């Protein structure tokens, strides 16, 4: 039975045929003024088999959102997937996949050196009690350990 085409790109992805971890271009959009938006699927865990626990995911979200901008001025957003298996990285007017992988690698290396989770307080975060620096580092370390496989999506 054929699955109907959905409006959301990731809903059209056969999650049974991917092999995490990976980084893939999930979408490209051209704006009316010529700007290019590229959205990357940065998958940490195998869909429907594993997921990131919320405190670790939440902390990694904060760390990467802050640190990645030290390496790339074109980053628009780093946001977690609701399924807790990965993140979306959105960039503006940048379309170099190899450079994105390098930026992600540098960012994850910096996560491993972090001494605190940025903005993990009640003034700057909506769930400040839900953080673990060590959990975020474990996720970053596992992702980096498979660096050679990031381009192998499996679809």
Curated annotation (Swiss-Prot):
Binds 1 Fe cation per subunit. Keywords: Autoinducer synthesis, Iron, Lyase, Metal-binding, Quorum sensing. InterPro entries: LuxS_sf (IPR037005), Metalloenz_LuxS/M16 (IPR011249), S-ribosylhomocysteinase (IPR003815). GO terms for cellular component: cytosol. Fe cation binds at residues 58, 62, 125. Disulfide bonds: none annotated. Its EC number is 4.4.1.21. Its cofactor is Fe cation. It is an enzyme of class 4 (lyase). One of its GO terms (biological process) is L-methionine salvage from S-adenosylmethionine. It catalyses: S-(5-deoxy-D-ribos-5-yl)-L-homocysteine = (S)-4,5-dihydroxypentane-2,3-dione + L-homocysteine. The keyword Repressor does not apply. The keyword Iron applies. It holds the Pfam family LuxS. GO terms for molecular function: iron ion binding; S-ribosylhomocysteine lyase activity. Coiled coil: none annotated. Homodimer. Involved in the synthesis of autoinducer 2 (AI-2) which is secreted by bacteria and is used to communicate both the cell density and the metabolic potential of the environment. The regulation of gene expression in response to changes in cell density is called quorum sensing. Catalyzes the transformation of S-ribosylhomocysteine (RHC) to homocysteine (HC) and 4,5-dihydroxy-2,3-pentadione (DPD). Belongs to the LuxS family. This is S-ribosylhomocysteine lyase.
